[in-house]
Amino acid sequence: MIIAIDGPAASGKGTLGKRLAAHYGYRHLDTGVIYRAVAKALLDQGAELTDETRAVAAAEALDPDTFADPALKSQTVGEAASVVSALPRVRAALLNFQRQFAAHPPGAVLDGRDIGTVICPEADVKIFVVADASVRAHRRTLEALARGEPADEAQVLADILKRDERDKSRAAAPLKAADDAHLLDNSHLDIESGVRAAIDIVEAVRAGRQRV
């Protein structure tokens, strides 16, 4: 089974992805991490984020062992990843990596921005997570402060709104809900309630297929 979770920045999709994967015993991939890894590689090289040739080279040289690097969670790397992820050749270079991960039995949970529309359009369950921008900015600010990083909530909100617009308007795999995705509004749900809602969606889909 493939479970696709999409949504904008700081909507809570990553936490839902991890918890769903643990619940069902599936592997989990936060696809945003792979774009952050590419972006960090370019930043470390001092390269332009729009240098598609160097970005593709970084994508092809990805080392999954680096995905746990705490530096990938920084606001700077996140903003850089949004720029890099808009490059069509970079998205193409990472397509097979993500699809091969999804095909691993007995199942996988992938979260990102184009899982249900581009990466795994045949996913068994598609969930599109949304949350108010102000709520997302507050969450992201608390996360940064918890890591010991300075964070101004007003600036974080401005960055999130800018990133939302960039993600929705990019030519390559824009952020949007798949036609058959289940909407999950995470604005006012705590983690446990959000996870329960996501599990309910998965179970409803599974029950419907068993009745067919």
UniProtKB/Swiss-Prot annotation:
It catalyses: CMP + ATP = CDP + ADP; dCMP + ATP = dCDP + ADP. CDD domains: CMPK. InterPro entries: Cytidylate_kin (IPR003136), Cytidylate_kinase_dom (IPR011994), P-loop_NTPase (IPR027417). Its EC number is 2.7.4.25. Disulfide bonds: none annotated. It is an enzyme of class 2 (transferase). It comes from the Bacteria. This is Cytidylate kinase. It comes from Rhodopseudomonas palustris (strain BisB18). The gene is cmk.
